[in-house]
From Swiss-Prot:
Key word Signal present: yes
Gene of this entry: LIP5
Similarity comment: Belongs to the AB hydrolase superfamily. Lipase family. Class Lip subfamily.
Transmembrane residue ranges: none
PANTHER family linked: LIPASE 5, PTHR34853
Region (Disordered): 480-512
UniProt keyword terms in alphabetical order: Disulfide bond, Glycoprotein, Hydrolase, Lipid degradation, Lipid metabolism, Secreted, Signal, Virulence
Protein name according to UniProt: Secreted triacylglycerol lipase LIP5
Length: 512
């Protein structure tokens, strides 16, 4: 989910760039590109992960800066909100030079929109003009070099599918898992007979990624998944949407409601139009269906949507039973049956201003209660927020993936909840190493060959950047029947009280 701190400086740029880009872009938008749709009838009868179309592309950053690697896109058969509901979507494969053919990292980029034009796959294309309107997936794509430099093949699915079903986790989970199947089936990748997969997603990408972890055992257990990484996790849809209302990125309240309803339209029909929205609400929905996240955020910056102006009677979205039912179905940890069975690294800022810490922590605890293997790292500094927490954790994410690909537990296994109380940004050495690496990696992809033989990440992950040794205070190790995860959250009255309680307990030695 993205991100109030970037909206201000993007507002003018987007306003000026959108007409220019729309007029001059040389690559058709997804809604106008036949590649995004099956060419023949009968695709519904194909197995999930079957390749329906394929093409080689020139990958680029911001539409013009070419990436020096091999890139393909495939349209593949997948499933929608339920395993028996056939669907299709596109994924993008990035292959670095000297790639390890047995290691694939699947990245769920945040899209946070109800418009197929905002799909990550389109953001990878070289269009010939500077593209910044759909900045949500583009900024994260600039960080992919961190994984490509390791020699790992990157798989980046359009996890919202043709419906652009933002916040519908199960829907996206199927599409993530089937993108892994598609990778295994795609011969040009030349993968080994049983390649290892790791899934990663932050913020809006954590939802499909977390659900892929949850559905792996029941839906695609033949996949050799060795781990999952997720942070800033939106694990409870309605909880998150309610907490965002009236905040800078409040347009996501409408976008999230639309996404949930679109994923289950055969069950709920036109609930939003028939029962929920006022005329102003319908206008807002139309805006969401025709814009990417920054455009909608700028237009509705700080709007309170759960009010009489947008919702009939000024009701809360949770007051509709259908909405509660679907949200519960898409809440991670709600159903013990869908518990991840592969190691998970989760991280979250205690004072995350976008996605409340409580819901992610609750999900981790519930997963642990049901036998999952979770390492949950909390950042308790008030100065660490949504975006900076992600950037500062990139070395940790890479280290976790390295260890998992090499068969290591990374931290000893089981469930473990830790807190890092010192802001890493206050440590000049860590700040310099982390951000220099990120910046160098981003710049490196502009004109150089990308792969493990370049100079970017060599010796990047030193002991000072490993969460097992750096500024880590062990909060508690979870044991069977002994779950006590502490308190924290955003700056609401309830969360401030909880955070104060946590600090008091820590001071008196209850957390050590």
């Amino acid at each position: 989910m993205m991100y109030a701190s970037l909206v201000h400086w993007l507002a003018l740029a987007v306003a000026l760039a959108v007409p220019f880009v729309t007029a001059l872009g040389s690559v058709p938008y997804p809604q106008d590109d036949p590649f995004y749709y099956p060419s023949e009838n009968g695709w519904q009868n194909e197995a999930p992960g079957t390749i329906l179309r394929q093409r080689k592309i020139q990958a680029a950053s911001l539409g013009i800066f070419e990436w020096k690697l091999d890139a393909w896109q495939v349209l593949y058969r997948t499933a929608g909100a339920r395993p028996d509901k056939p669907s299709y979507t596109v994924t993008t494969f990035l292959v670095p030079s000297h790639a390890h053919r047995d290691r694939v990292v699947t990245i769920s980029s945040p899209e946070n929109s109800n418009f197929i034009q905002c799909a990550p796959s389109y953001a990878f294309r070289k269009t010939g003009v500077l593209e910044i309107a759909n900045f949500e997936p583009r900024w994260e794509q600039m960080l992919y070099t961190l994984f490509l430099a390791e020699g790992w093949i990157v798989n980046a699915p359009d996890h919202e599918g043709p419906e652009s079903a933002f916040s519908a986790g199960r829907f996206g989970g199927h599409m993530v898992l089937d993108s892994m199947r598609a990778a295994n089936n795609f011969k040009p990748l030349q993968l080994s007979s049983n390649p290892m997969h790791i899934g990663h997603g932050y913020s809006g990408g954590s939802t499909p990624n977390g659900w892929a972890a949850s559905l792996h055992e029941s839906y695609a257990n033949e996949l050799n998944v060795v781990g999952w990484s997720l942070g800033g996790s939106m694990t409870d849809p309605l909880y998150t949407l309610n907490s965002l209302d009236g905040k800078p990125t409040s347009s996501l309240v409408v976008a999230g409601a639309i996404g949930l309803m679109d994923a289950y339209r055969d069950e709920v029909g036109n609930l939003l139009d028939d029962e929920v929205w006022t005329e102003e609400g319908k206008i807002a929905e139309k805006v969401m269906r025709n814009s990417c996240v920054y455009e909608s955020v700028i237009r509705y910056f700080g709007t309170t949507f759960q009010s009489e102006r947008y919702i009939k009677g000024g009701r809360n979205l949770s007051s509709w039973p259908q909405m509660r039912k679907i949200s519960n179905m898409n809440t991670m940890g709600h159903n013990p049956r869908f518990t991840p069975r592969k190691p998970i690294f989760m991280f979250h800022a205690l004072y995350d201003e976008e996605i409340n810490w409580h819901q992610a922590n609750k999900t981790a605890v519930e997963w642990c209660n049901n036998g999952a293997n979770v390492r949950f790292l909390t950042y308790s500094s008030t100065s660490l927020v949504h975006v900076t927490t992600y950037l500062l954790n990139l070395p940790y994410i890479v280290q976790y993936m390295r260890d998992r690909f090499n068969g290591k537990d990374w931290y000893g296994g089981g469930c473990q909840f830790d807190v890092e109380s010192q802001n890493p940004a206050l440590d000049v050495n860590v700040l310099g190493e982390r951000f220099r690496g990120i910046l160098e990696a981003a710049l490196d992809m502009l004109g150089k060959e990308i792969g493990p033989n370049d100079s970017i990440l060599k010796n990047r992950l030193k002991a000072g950047q490993n969460p097992n040794t750096h500024h880590k205070t062990k909060l508690h190790v979870l044991k069977k029947g002994d779950i006590s995860p502490g308190e924290g959250g955003d700056h609401t009255k309830e969360s401030k009280k909880a955070a104060a309680k946590f600090k008091a307990e820590k001071k008196h030695g209850k957390h050590h």
